[in-house]
From Swiss-Prot:
Keywords: Cytoplasm, GTP-binding, Ligase, Magnesium, Metal-binding, Nucleotide-binding, Purine biosynthesis. Mg(2+) binds at D13, G40. One of its GO terms (molecular function) is GTP binding. The gene is purA. Homodimer. This is Adenylosuccinate synthetase.
Amino acid sequence: MGNVIILGSQWGDEGKGKIVDLFAERFDIVARYQGGHNAGHTVFIGEKKFVLKLIPSGILRPGKKAVIGNGLVIDPAALLSEIDTLQAAGVPVMGNLFISNRAHVLFPAHRMMEKMSEGREGRVSIGTTSRGIGPCYEDKIARRGIRIADLLDTEFFRAQYASVMEEKVLIAKALGIYSELDLRAIRDEYEAFAERIRPMVCDTSVLLNDAIRSGKTVMFEGAQGTMLDIDHGTYPFVTSSSASAGGACTGTGVAPTRISGVLGVSKAYITRVGGGPFPTEAFDGAGDRIRERGKEFGAVTGRPRRCGWFDVPLLRYTANINGFDSLVITKLDVLDEFDQIPVCVSYRIGNREVVDMPPTVAEMEKVEPVYECVPGWNTSTFGISQFGELPAKAKEYLAYLENRTGVEVGCVSTGPERNQTIVRAGSRFESLIG
């Protein structure tokens, strides 16, 4: 057992929130390292449903520390709303949540820029959540962003805010996308936000590294999925942050040498929200069956997810980028009623058959999936928590995925509750989780 990264191996929505929540009790700290409030982790505890967008799922475990790393962009209003909701539900937040002083701050102007630019003529529609995440990261990369540490220094913040917002207004007006903002009222509101979060702000890189040196363990919680990574995803239909394993280091300030392992989370099928290529998307009614059985609607937006079949070339690609030690397969029970389960094993582009992910969207949109069909099991797997109790055909399906991807399946989720989970004895997953 050591310091472990848990992240999505597909296009997000793989069920990471449940897995992080379930195993957080075995770690001392859970740290988020990228993204913003555009990605929601849904966790069920008995009759209670929690949708966490910024705060790590580990906050739901008594006595565990939760860290929001420097790689995130933070809308203070969204963060404080989440804190208030947790506290109202009896979850202790103060003293358990730590916010990086180097994380960037998201403003209403960022939302304005995103909403308007997404609809501009000639612009490729990415299908964003319109929460301003991309424009905030743009400011970060352009070195004009405002960080949490800046927000806490009132005099410095006021000067920086005036300069940045003046530029934003000029750009928005030039592009014809300006909508009226009361910049003074927003500034005052953010100064009030600063006082509420001040007790939780620190240098989280120091906190994490000191904890690791003292023998404590950290779980790094990824948001979204590798295929939405700014560098390695289906660009430009991606998010604006590093959603792969490398982002855990840059987004927290913890060195790669201090990471013990990487666990990938994947559905037993695959889904995607928003635009972009999706080679195995099912259009023949099977996609609708998966969506209804799996309740595939976005945790943040409520949008119906596009659904399709497991994509082996995609998984091999994300396993290679992240160095997965083990896979978690979620929502196995969603496939319980299928007689045959197609699995994409390669792609055909024209008269060529390829087994690797094409690098461009243009090529991705031309691929035809090559399927092999695996027999279904037509027996309920819902709630099973012991591998030996799975139907033989369900075990064969998991073995097939292992053989095709080259990565062990060390954990299987068969329902939304904590106890509806299988950990395979002797697996690399078990050794990393402890």
